Protein backbone atom coordinates (compact mmCIF):
# COMPACT_ATOMS: atom_id res chain seq x y z
CA UNK A 1 0.00 0.00 0.00
CA UNK A 2 1.35 3.41 -0.94
CA UNK A 3 1.65 6.24 1.56
CA UNK A 4 1.64 10.01 1.07
CA UNK A 5 5.18 11.37 1.03
CA UNK A 6 6.00 15.01 1.74
CA UNK A 7 9.07 15.57 -0.43
CA UNK A 8 9.98 18.79 1.38
CA UNK A 9 9.85 17.10 4.78
CA UNK A 10 11.81 14.10 3.48
CA UNK A 11 14.56 16.38 2.16
CA UNK A 12 14.67 18.46 5.37
CA UNK A 13 15.31 15.29 7.41
CA UNK A 14 18.52 14.58 5.52
CA UNK A 15 21.70 15.62 7.29
CA UNK A 16 24.40 14.74 4.74
CA UNK A 17 24.84 16.45 1.40
CA UNK A 18 24.88 14.21 -1.69
CA UNK A 19 23.41 11.25 0.21
CA UNK A 20 20.15 10.36 -1.60
CA UNK A 21 17.28 8.68 0.24
CA UNK A 22 14.74 6.44 -1.49
CA UNK A 23 11.19 7.69 -0.81
CA UNK A 24 9.32 5.45 -3.26
CA UNK A 25 9.50 3.12 -6.19
CA UNK A 26 7.70 2.92 -9.52
CA UNK A 27 8.12 -0.41 -11.32
CA UNK A 28 11.89 -0.78 -11.87
CA UNK A 29 12.76 2.77 -10.76
CA UNK A 30 13.39 4.55 -7.46
CA UNK A 31 12.19 8.01 -6.47
CA UNK A 32 14.84 9.66 -4.28
CA UNK A 33 15.33 12.95 -2.49
CA UNK A 34 18.68 14.52 -1.72
CA UNK A 35 20.06 17.61 -0.06
CA UNK A 36 23.02 18.89 -2.08
CA UNK A 37 25.65 21.61 -1.88
CA UNK A 38 28.91 22.01 -3.73
CA UNK A 39 30.00 19.67 -6.50
CA UNK A 40 29.41 15.91 -6.65
CA UNK A 41 31.83 14.53 -9.29
CA UNK A 42 32.07 14.04 -13.03
CA UNK A 43 30.48 10.69 -13.90
CA UNK A 44 28.12 8.90 -16.26
CA UNK A 45 25.57 6.10 -16.12
CA UNK A 46 26.15 3.90 -19.16
CA UNK A 47 22.79 2.10 -19.10
CA UNK A 48 20.43 4.51 -17.34
CA UNK A 49 18.91 7.96 -17.82
CA UNK A 50 18.76 10.15 -14.69
CA UNK A 51 16.01 12.69 -13.96
CA UNK A 52 16.73 15.70 -11.72
CA UNK A 53 13.86 17.84 -10.36
CA UNK A 54 14.68 20.85 -8.17
CA UNK A 55 12.41 21.04 -5.12
CA UNK A 56 14.17 23.99 -3.47
CA UNK A 57 17.08 26.19 -4.53
CA UNK A 58 19.11 26.08 -7.73
CA UNK A 59 21.16 23.34 -9.39
CA UNK A 60 23.63 23.48 -12.26
CA UNK A 61 24.27 20.30 -14.19
CA UNK A 62 27.59 20.58 -15.97
CA UNK A 63 27.83 18.62 -19.21
CA UNK A 64 30.90 18.34 -21.41
CA UNK A 65 29.49 20.79 -23.98
CA UNK A 66 27.31 23.08 -21.82
CA UNK A 67 25.83 23.73 -18.39
CA UNK A 68 22.12 23.43 -17.58
CA UNK A 69 20.76 25.81 -14.91
CA UNK A 70 17.73 24.59 -12.97
CA UNK A 71 15.59 26.54 -10.51
CA UNK A 72 12.81 25.38 -8.21
CA UNK A 73 10.26 23.36 -10.19
CA UNK A 74 12.59 22.72 -13.15
CA UNK A 75 13.59 19.24 -14.26
CA UNK A 76 16.21 17.85 -16.60
CA UNK A 77 16.95 14.34 -17.83
CA UNK A 78 20.59 13.39 -18.29
CA UNK A 79 20.61 10.72 -21.03
CA UNK A 80 22.45 7.47 -20.43
CA UNK A 81 26.14 7.61 -21.23
CA UNK A 82 26.40 11.42 -20.89
CA UNK A 83 29.13 12.62 -18.52
CA UNK A 84 27.77 15.16 -16.04
CA UNK A 85 28.54 16.85 -12.75
CA UNK A 86 25.74 18.32 -10.60
CA UNK A 87 26.71 21.48 -8.69
CA UNK A 88 24.80 23.62 -6.16
CA UNK A 89 26.40 26.87 -4.98
CA UNK A 90 23.94 27.00 -2.06
CA UNK A 91 21.95 24.24 -0.37
CA UNK A 92 19.48 22.71 -2.81
CA UNK A 93 16.86 19.96 -2.44
CA UNK A 94 16.31 17.65 -5.40
CA UNK A 95 14.20 14.71 -6.46
CA UNK A 96 15.89 12.00 -8.52
CA UNK A 97 14.07 9.45 -10.62
CA UNK A 98 16.31 6.62 -11.76
CA UNK A 99 16.29 2.90 -12.44
CA UNK A 100 16.98 0.67 -9.45
CA UNK A 101 20.22 -0.44 -11.13
CA UNK A 102 21.62 3.12 -11.24
CA UNK A 103 24.84 3.50 -9.25
CA UNK A 104 24.93 6.72 -7.20
CA UNK A 105 28.08 8.11 -8.81
CA UNK A 106 27.90 6.03 -11.96
CA UNK A 107 31.23 4.86 -13.32
CA UNK A 108 33.34 6.35 -10.49
CA UNK A 109 33.57 5.61 -6.78
CA UNK A 110 34.37 8.45 -4.38
CA UNK A 111 33.98 9.06 -0.64
CA UNK A 112 30.44 10.40 -1.20
CA UNK A 113 29.30 7.32 -3.17
CA UNK A 114 26.31 5.66 -1.47
CA UNK A 115 25.15 2.10 -2.06
CA UNK A 116 21.49 1.32 -2.72
CA UNK A 117 21.34 -0.27 0.76
CA UNK A 118 22.50 3.03 2.30
CA UNK A 119 19.96 4.98 0.23
CA UNK A 120 17.13 2.73 1.45
CA UNK A 121 17.91 3.34 5.16
CA UNK A 122 15.85 5.86 7.09
CA UNK A 123 17.77 9.13 7.62
CA UNK A 124 19.33 9.47 11.06
Predicted regions and their residues:
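Short beta-strand His + acidic residue motifs that chelate non-heme Fe in jelly-roll/DSBH
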Residues: 43, 61-62, 78, 83-89, ...
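A cytosolic small-molecule/anion-sensing beta-strand core signal
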Residues: 27, 55-56, 71-72, 90
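Short, conserved beta-strand element in jelly-roll/cupin
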Residues: 35-36, 45-62, 97
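Short acidic-glycine-tyrosine-enriched beta hairpin
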Residues: 64-80
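A short glycine-rich, His/Asp/Glu-containing loop-to-beta-strand
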Residues: 7-42, 48
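Short glycine-/acidic-enriched loop or helix-start segments at secondary-structure transitions
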Residues: 63-64, 72, 88, 106
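Short, charged/polar surface micro-motifs in flexible loops or helix N-caps
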Residues: 28-30, 37-39, 56-60, 67, ...
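Double-stranded beta-helix
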Residues: 3-11, 24, 89-124
Amino acid sequence: MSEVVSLGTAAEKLSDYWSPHVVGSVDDSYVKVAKVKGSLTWHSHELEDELFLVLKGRLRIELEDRAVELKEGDMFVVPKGVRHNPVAEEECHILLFERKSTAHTGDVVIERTRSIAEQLKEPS
